[in-house]
């Protein structure tokens, strides 16, 4: 399994695309690396536990944005005593950067970790990231000996779905599935 992880919330939908790209392109003929994503720091505590002490079946790729554009300062809340006062006045960028460094160090002691770094998230850098992953997917599929451009596994469920929903041309399969499902 490969986990693509980042501390950048703007990458949420990018993760979905990345998972689809690699799962659909490599996941055939009993080949491929199962792609998953980690949206840190949100999932760091739960997923981090598995990464630190669970089965060693994962390698991790960090997509690190050196200069995130968003900025927010932690302000004191006099109503709640939660032992997080030491964070008052700190920018979330500083907190995320420290958490990234701590996470990379801890995880790299347990599993292979790689870092892909971009300066900022701009339309140009997004283009670079998309191109990088599309090209690496193409190359890795070639190494695995699979065609990254077909999707036979997807076709199986689509045919069943078409039959069950009554799409013309799928009548025989619909009858076969009806007998199996009841």
Predicted ranges, named:
Residues 1-182:
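A SIS-like phosphosugar-recognition module
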């Amino acid at each position: 399994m490969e986990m693509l992880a980042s501390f950048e919330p703007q990458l949420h939908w990018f993760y979905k695309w990345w998972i689809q790209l690699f799962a659909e392109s490599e996941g055939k003929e009993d080949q491929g690396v199962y792609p998953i994503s980690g949206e840190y720091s949100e999932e760091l505590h739960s997923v981090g536990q598995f990464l630190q002490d669970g089965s060693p079946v994962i390698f991790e790729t960090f997509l690190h944005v050196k200069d995130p554009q968003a900025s927010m300062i932690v302000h004191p809340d006099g109503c709640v005593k939660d032992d997080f006062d030491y964070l008052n006045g700190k920018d979330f960028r500083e907190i995320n950067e420290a958490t990234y460094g701590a996470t990379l160090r801890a995880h790299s002691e347990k599993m292979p970790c790689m870092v892909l770094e971009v300066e900022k998230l701009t339309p140009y850098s997004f283009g670079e990231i998309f191109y990088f992953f599309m090209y690496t997917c193409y190359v890795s599929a070639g190494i695995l000996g699979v065609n990254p451009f077909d999707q036979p596994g997807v076709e199986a469920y689509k045919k069943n779905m078409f039959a069950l929903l009554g799409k013309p041309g799928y009548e025989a399969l619909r009858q076969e599935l009806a007998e199996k499902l009841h």
